[in-house]
Structures are given as C-alpha cells and as structure tokens.
C-alpha cells in the first residue's frame, strides 16, 4: 500500500494482527465509520465523564476484521472510560495532548500511570482501565482492540463503581 500525504505534518497509525480471512485492503472514509461522533458521559456524573468518541470500525461494518478501533477526544479535567471496565481482549491507547505538555492518569488494574503526549499504553486481557485528564489540557487517544476470532467484545464495568452511571446518583451527602 502506498500513502501520499497532502498536508504537512501528517501522522499515520498502523495496527496489524494475524487474520485467517482473505480480503482486499481498503481505505475507510469518514462516512464509512461506524459512528462519526458519539457524545458520552452526558447526563451522568454531573458531566465529569464527558467525552466525544468516534468508532472507526468493528465487525458490524467490516465483517472480516479482527480489530475494533476508534478515538476519544477527552475533555480537560474529566474522566474517560469511567466507571472502570475490563474485557478479555488486549487494548492499546496512543495519546496526544493539547497543549503538548499535558498529561493524564491511566488506571491499569491497581496501578496508575502518568501518560504524556505520544505515549503508548498497552492493556493486557482482563485488566481494569479508566482515564483522568488534567485540567486545562485536552486529551486525545486512539484505541485499538484486537478482537477474539469470531467472538463479540464484551466489556464489564467494575460493579462497585457502576452506581455512578445512575442519572439520579448523588455525589455529596447534602446535594439537592
């Protein structure tokens, strides 16, 4: 495959994996994507998990794929992928920040990592994960999940934190 970039600078992410299915490569355009833009976290947690998600593709639009790939534009000072969740598939996050000196904290099981501009974080199977971005900095991350052969992705929230998704949840004892 040959790519001609028409802008300066340009970045390309390449994800590769084994796939027993035979199929021709193809270029997906924005209109081919599963969701062009999905606002998540609205109406729960007082908006503290507000983010925009764009899912590029999964098996519903590319039946031959072994990937589920998309991106998140994460609001400054807010959480993403909260409550923490897990799945049996491994996942990669590739980070960008604006301004570039920003950072976020990435939960990885019982640990947290400071992730910065151009960092890559790999999540092993069945490891809980969520993100918290610093105030004043916008975070972008590209996510890539290697799907199991012929099995759907099943994400599971950590039960002890799932209550925060209730639109009527109260976060402070005297909150009205």
Language-model region placement:
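Conserved metal-binding segment of the jelly-roll/cupin
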Residues: 1-6, 17, 114-136, 142-146
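Short histidine-centered beta-strand/loop micro-motifs
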Residues: 4, 80-87, 106, 113, ...
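Short, structured patches in soluble enzyme cores that scaffold and shape functional sites
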Residues: 5-7, 14-19, 55-59, 71-76, ...
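Double-stranded beta-helix
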Residues: 8-51, 107, 142-176
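Conserved hydrophobic/aromatic beta-strand scaffold that supports enzyme active sites
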Residues: 12-14, 69-73, 92-94, 112, ...
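A short glycine-rich, His/Asp/Glu-containing loop-to-beta-strand
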Residues: 46-92
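Coil-to-beta-strand transition motifs
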Residues: 64-65, 90, 99-103, 137-139
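A short beta-strand-loop-beta hairpin characteristic of the jelly-roll/cupin
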Residues: 93-117
């Amino acid at each position: 495959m040959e790519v001609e970039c028409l802008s300066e600078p340009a970045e390309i992410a390449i994800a590769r994996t084994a796939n027993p299915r035979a199929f021709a490569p193809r270029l997906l355009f924005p209109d081919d994507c599963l969701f062009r833009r999905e606002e998540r976290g609205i109406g729960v947690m007082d908006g503290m998990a507000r983010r925009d998600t764009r899912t590029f593709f999964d098996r519903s639009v590319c039946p031959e794929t072994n990937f589920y790939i998309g991106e998140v534009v994460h609001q400054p000072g807010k959480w993403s992928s909260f409550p923490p969740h897990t799945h049996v598939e491994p996942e990669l996050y590739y980070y960008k920040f604006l301004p570039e000196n920003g950072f976020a904290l990435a939960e990885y099981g019982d640990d947290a990592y400071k992730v910065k501009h151009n960092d890559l974080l790999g999540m092993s199977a069945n490891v809980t994960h969520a993100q918290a971005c610093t105030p004043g900095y916008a975070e972008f991350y590209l996510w890539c999940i290697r799907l199991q052969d012929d099995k759907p992705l099943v994400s599971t929230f950590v039960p002890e934190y799932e209550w925060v998704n209730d639109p009527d949840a109260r976060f402070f004892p005297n909150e009205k």
